[in-house]
């Protein structure tokens, strides 16, 4: 999925932040043919998932220099998918030590301390995701949000947006129902920005609220230029 209108997307924002902080990035060869495996796993396509797992782990083992570098992913649901693969990596003597980190956690720990925020938003509506919750990344998410905005608002009725990969595209009524209450809370006022950490969730929340949601790293990149 492409970035929200006027945005650059999470990957270019992450690369910009790394360059600004003096952190080198290595992109695996053939990355356009790699996947976290969630589309196969979530639909029960076991054989396809196993094939992709073997392909991804072999590629990342080479790209990380045998596990010397962390693998950073810029979409929370994909990080969760790779984290599931990590259990297989831990059981395999061929790929010991592969480490998967969500970009929000990596930026909070290794990038944010090296940056200077030069312009803040007045207010930001923030949507944590199911995957960021499972990964334990919500503290990092809120810390970055606080760095880019004077006020951070997570709706009291926050919960799953029910976009669930392609479910929100095929059955938009699921997202409409799941987000009704939190959308009302968000739309009770106007915010300077709307952020999350996963493109499909951003699409779901954009549909629910009528406001354009973008990845939190896009806001951080803009705030530190």
Annotate each predicted stretch with a short phrase.
Residues 1-225:
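Iron-sulfur cluster-binding electron-transfer modules in prokaryotic oxidoreductases
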């Amino acid at each position: 999925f492409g970035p929200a209108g006027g945005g650059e997307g999470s990957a270019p924002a992450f690369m910009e932040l790394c360059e600004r902080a003096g952190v080198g990035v290595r992109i695996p060869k053939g990355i356009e043919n790699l996947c976290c495996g969630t589309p196969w796993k979530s639909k029960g396509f076991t054989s396809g998932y196993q094939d992709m797992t073997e392909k991804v782990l072999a590629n990342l083992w080479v790209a990380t220099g045998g596990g010397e570098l962390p693998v950073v992913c810029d979409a929370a649901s994909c990080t969760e998918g790779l984290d599931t693969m990590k259990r297989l990596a831990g059981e395999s003597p061929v790929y010991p030590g592969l480490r998967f980190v969500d970009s929000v956690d990596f930026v909070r720990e290794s990038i944010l301390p090296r940056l200077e925020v030069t312009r803040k938003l007045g207010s930001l509506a923030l949507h944590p995701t199911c995957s960021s919750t499972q990964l334990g990344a919500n503290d990092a998410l809120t810390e970055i949000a606080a760095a880019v905005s004077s006020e951070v608002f997570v709706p009291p009725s926050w919960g799953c947006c029910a976009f669930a990969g392609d479910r929100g595209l095929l059955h938009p009524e699921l997202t409409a129902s799941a987000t009704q209450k939190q959308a009302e809370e968000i739309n009770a006022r106007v915010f300077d920005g709307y952020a999350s950490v996963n493109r499909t969730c951003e699409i779901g929340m954009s549909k629910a609220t009528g406001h354009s949601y973008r990845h939190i790293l896009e806001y951080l990149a803009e705030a530190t230029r």
